[in-house]
Amino acid sequence: MPRSQRNDNFIDKTFTIVADILLRVIPTTQREKEAFTYYRDGMSAQSEGEYAEALQNYYKAMRLEIDPYDRSYILYNIGLIHTSNGEHAKALEYYSQALERNPSLPQAFNNMAVICHYRGEQAIQQGDPETSEAWFDQAAEYWKQAIALAPSNYIEAQNWLKITGRLKEWV
């Protein structure tokens, strides 16, 4: 039974019902419907912390989905799972792939910045200030891109850029 048919969450059920109606009304191919079903089931599994199941659904959706914009969101969600699992190198790879297909994803730039900032903090703890600065510089570049796409978002990142003197390089 597809995950969407066994969902107990009210919001997910509502989303599923609306999505099913839209799939019937909007002209789409069977392949597109199947890809969306896998994507929807992946989101449902991901929201419940069932990451292995979510990844399986996302990979199936990727095999079927041909639209670059839609693929970007699948790749982004795969990146989220790898981030949650602490697999930062993989997460960065998937966020990059998402941005190749859709360069207007500020949340992907933000998540990449957060990972780089985290790695910078780790380098400080390991006594490696040079590596730390490189990671922080990379985080700054990603945050600048996120802020350029969504200027009213990422206030903490904007403050960090100001405090660390990285904002004036950009303005």
Swiss-Prot record:
Transmembrane spans: none
Could you tell me which Gene3D superfamilies the record lists for this protein?
Tetratricopeptide repeat domain (1.25.40.10)
Name the domain of life this protein comes from: Eukaryota
> Where is the protein found, in the record's own terms?
Plastid, Chloroplast thylakoid membrane
Broad class of the protein's primary localization: plastid
Is Lipoprotein a UniProt keyword of this protein?
Answer: no
The cellular component terms of Gene Ontology attached to this UniProt record, alphabetical and capped at eight, are:
chloroplast thylakoid membrane
Q: Please list the GO biological process terms of this entry.
A: photosynthesis
What is its biological role? Essential for the assembly of the photosystem I (PSI) complex. May act as a chaperone-like factor to guide the assembly of the PSI subunits.
Recorded family membership = Belongs to the Ycf3 family.
| Name of the protein described by the UniProt record | Photosystem I assembly protein Ycf3
Q: Which organism is it from?
A: Angiopteris evecta
Q: What is the lineage of its organism?
A: Eukaryota, Viridiplantae, Streptophyta, Embryophyta, Tracheophyta
- Corresponding gene? ycf3
